[in-house]
Each structure stands twice: as structure tokens, then as C-alpha cells.
Amino acid sequence: PQETGLTYNSWFGKFHLEMIWWHQSHFPLWGHPELLNRTLGWYHRAEPVARQIAERQGFDGIRWMKMTDPDAMEAPSKVGSFLIWQQPHLIHLAELVYRATKDEAVLKNYYDLVMKTAEFMYSFATYDEANDRYILKGIIAAQETLRASENLNPPMELSSWHYGLSTAQLWRERMGEPRVAEWDTLLAKLSPLAKDAEGKLYLASEDATDSYTNKRFISDHPAVTGALGMYPESRLLDKEIMNNTIDKIFEVWNWDETWGWDYPMIAMCAARVGEPDK
């Protein structure tokens, strides 16, 4: 899918895999899982290339890249190669199709892809021995103003990692397979969302302590809201702090530097904290 939909030719029509969630995750929710299911066949065709990418980079499983050609070969990008928020989408989308259909054939069709996607996610996370936790680093966040060389534990990615691995474990249970102990360890020790010094706001990432005063961090996607807007509540976050964070975003954000999907993301986050009229 394109990043800006069907009416504007962004990036010369290049393929942006993270946009499939925005373009098609809604279909199963209003009675048309078959439309999403039809598209998900691409992941089967792309799996050999995605597996080679993960292997070349020293990871397990399969890595879904942000920007590729239609056959999943990487397209050159100084940003796209560092993004990871598209990685759990296959798990999320397959789960939505299964929930809508309750068809065991869906589990069988996507089970191997779900497992290999989760294997990459586990191997990509880094164990921080000094603090006995798992972290996400060396990435550009969905809020692309955060630099890969500095970025540590961006909030939306943390939530997506927790959701993706939790759901992969649920698929194992549905298929009569035991849970993977190492995945459960990661889920228990995955870093929570980073907070400001007063503990009242969530940061753009753990290193971005000036998240609401530095123009770089109040521009682009307010991706911190995606941690709850796109993914369900988890032990990683607190709704009251997220509500405070939404209020702060409304107060200080550089709205001229936002994108179309930022607004539904904030709206869904507001609904989940009990403030749908925001």
C-alpha cells in the first residue's frame, strides 16, 4: 500500500508495508475479513525473502521490511531500513481475521508465519543485564524524528512487541502447542513506557527527556498515542498517564508537521482512556 492512500502519489507510489494496518485492519471489524485475508496472501509469497533478510542480519525468523518492491526485496531508504513497527502487523491482522471468522483454517494458514514473525521479534529485542529487562534499540521509531543512534524504547514499538508476542503465544495455545518459555520471559521483563521526571507523562522514547520542549520531538507522528490507540492495554502503560499525555500533545504539538493517520490514532487512544469526545 501507499503511505497516503489512493488519491496522492507519495514517494512515487513506493510500497510501504507499515501502511497495510491503516488501509485494511478495519475490514474484519465490519464483516469483511475476506478482503483482508485476500491481501495477506502476499506474506506467504514474501516469506522466503523476509527470511533471508533476517538471516543476513543475524536474527531468527523472518523480518518484514518497511519499504520493498512487490516481491519483498528491499528498497533503498535511510529511514525505512531502521523501522520495526510493521513487524507485528502480520500477527495483528491474522488475529483480526481469526476473531471475525473463528475458522481453524485461518490458524493453520498463518500459523507458521505468525511463529516466524514472533521468532524475529524475540531475537531482535536486547536483554539489558544491568537492569534485568528487555529493550528495543538501534531503530527509528514510528515518530521518525527520533534518531536510530540514540533511540531507546519508543512507546508504540514496545506496545506492539508486547501485543505481537502475547498473541503468538495465544496462537500456540489454540494449536495445542506449549508456550515458548523465552517469550514469556521477554513479556514479563519488557521495558514499560518511559515517563518524565514527575511520572506524569509518557516520553517519545526513553532517551528523549525533553519530549515536550524540543521541537524535533513534538513534530511528526505523535506515536506515543499509538501505544494504546493501536494496541490494547497492557502492563506496560497506565491509562491516567496516557490521558495526561494526550492533553500535553494537544497543548504543544507542531500540527503542521503531522500526517493523515495521526488523527485517528489519537482518537482511538482517547477512546481507550475513556475520553472519546476529545
PLM features per residue range, with description:
Residues 6-9, 100, 142-146, 275-276:
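Flexible loop/turn segments at secondary-structure boundaries
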Residues 38-42, 55, 107-115, 133-139:
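Beta-strand segments within the central parallel beta-sheet cores of soluble alpha/beta enzyme folds
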Residues 90, 111-115, 119-120:
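Extracytoplasmic, non-cytosolic globular domains
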Residues 16-52, 83-100, 104, 108, ...:
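Active-site core of glycosidic bond-cleaving carbohydrate-active enzymes
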